[in-house]
């Protein structure tokens, strides 16, 4: 199969004068090379397309592909992740990962939480601060947690994100409003363990790949999976693929949220426990990072015994099945689905019971 790759390369934007933080969600050359190598190992030919601007030019020249593996994040607005999928749909080109509606919904964390909450799933109580006047209207008990409503890679999350009083809330919200030019999500701070849940598939076919606990080491910014902690994860963060009662509860909430939000093919759901040990939905990442070494989903898969190529094959197989296309992956299906709370294992490898 001839597969096009759409992406935003971080170094291109840095050369244009954007900051390290502004480009934090964009991809490295290693990510693109890793995708090429994985898809090549699965028997496919790949074509580097690039950003939406490159895609527009190539479509206008009449270029087409059997499938597009889209990891483009976009640059501006709540619909930035939806731009490439919308263009591909206009040209009737199949692509990997979620559709424009889901990507826009998931990027706006407040909207996603409303959908999850309205479907009966637990998520921390929250308020949206769109203007400085909204700060006084926040009536939630402290401590609270503040973050930009539509950023990824923990952008905008730091030491001041956890607030203990009204003065700190005002200070943090004003800083985030000015710095990120978007609303601030203010939610009840949950003091318990934090997990990220890997999911493969769509709808009824979706299943949990594994549950990865995120633990902060000595020297890390305390109590939060911040931008600083994530950027220096090698020394500040410990990731542990774990199984137990809490992990099973986290997996169930995550899988239900994934299905309710309409996410497709593969990604992550972040879960945190409250002071009673109950699992709550924090946010979903339907366009998860795929760096072959350091991305959370890849780390999770590796600890589950799956290499990068197998993970990419699983995601691609899910997209092929969803599109009703004949599977052209030479390696065939790369996984065996398992029940919630269990880890998907490659063929020939026994699954472990939590």
What residue ranges belong to the model's regions?
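ATP-binding N-terminal substructure of ATP-dependent carboxylate-amine bond-forming enzymes
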Residues: 1-96, 101, 105-107, 130-136, ...
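Active-site nucleotide/adenylate-binding loops and adjacent lid/helix of ATP-dependent enzymes
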Residues: 1-7, 60-62, 104-185, 191-193, ...
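Short acidic/His/Gly/Ser-rich catalytic and metal-binding motifs that mark active-site loops
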Residues: 12-16, 152-154, 220, 291-292
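Short glycine-enriched, charge-decorated loop/helix-capping segments at active-site entrances
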Residues: 19-24, 158-162, 298-300
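Hydrophobic beta-strand scaffold residues
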Residues: 46, 94-95, 123, 144, ...
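ATP-dependent carboxylate activation and anion-phosphoryl transfer catalytic cores
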Residues: 117-120, 243-354
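Phosphate-binding site of ATP-dependent enzymes
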Residues: 165-245, 249-252, 273-280
């Amino acid at each position: 199969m001839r597969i096009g790759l759409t992406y935003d390369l971080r170094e291109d934007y840095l050369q244009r004068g954007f900051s390290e933080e502004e480009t934090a969600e964009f991809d490295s050359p290693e990510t693109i090379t890793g995708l090429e190598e994985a898809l090549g190992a699965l028997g496919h030919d790949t074509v580097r397309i690039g950003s939406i601007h490159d895609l527009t030019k190539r479509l206008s020249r009449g270029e087409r592909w059997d499938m597009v593996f889209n990891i483009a994040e976009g640059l501006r607005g709540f619909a930035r992740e939806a731009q490439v999928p919308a263009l591909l749909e206009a040209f009737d080109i199949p692509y990997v990962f979620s559709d424009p509606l889901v990507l826009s919904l998931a990027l706006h964390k407040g909207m996603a939480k409303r959908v999850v909450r309205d479907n009966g799933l637990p998520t921390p109580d929250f308020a949206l601060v769109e203007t400085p006047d909204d700060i006084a209207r926040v009536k939630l008990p402290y401590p609270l947690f503040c973050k930009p409503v539509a950023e990824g890679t923990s952008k905008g999350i730091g030491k001041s994100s956890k607030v203990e009083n009204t003065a700190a809330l005002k200070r943090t919200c004003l800083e985030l409003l000015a710095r990120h030019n978007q609303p601030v999500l203010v939610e009840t701070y949950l003091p318990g363990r934090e997990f990220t849940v890997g999911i493969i598939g769509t709808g009824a076919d979706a299943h949990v790949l594994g549950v990865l606990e995120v633990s902060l080491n000595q020297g890390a910014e305390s109590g939060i999976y911040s931008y600083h902690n994530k950027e220096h994860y090698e020394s500040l963060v410990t990731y542990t693929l774990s199984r137990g009662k809490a992990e099973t509860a986290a997996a169930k909430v995550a899988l239900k949220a994934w299905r309710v939000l309409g996410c497709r093919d593969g990604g992550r759901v972040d879960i945190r426990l409250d002071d009673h040990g109950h699992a709550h939905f924090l946010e979903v990442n339907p366009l998860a990072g795929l760096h072959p070494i350091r991305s959370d989903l890849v780390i999770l898969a590796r600890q589950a015994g799956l290499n990068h190529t197998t993970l990419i094959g699983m995601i691609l197989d899910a997209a092929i099945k969803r599109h009703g296309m004949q599977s052209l992956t030479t390696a065939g299906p790369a996984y065996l689905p398992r029940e919630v709370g269990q880890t998907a294992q490659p063929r020939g490898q026994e699954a472990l019971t939590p």
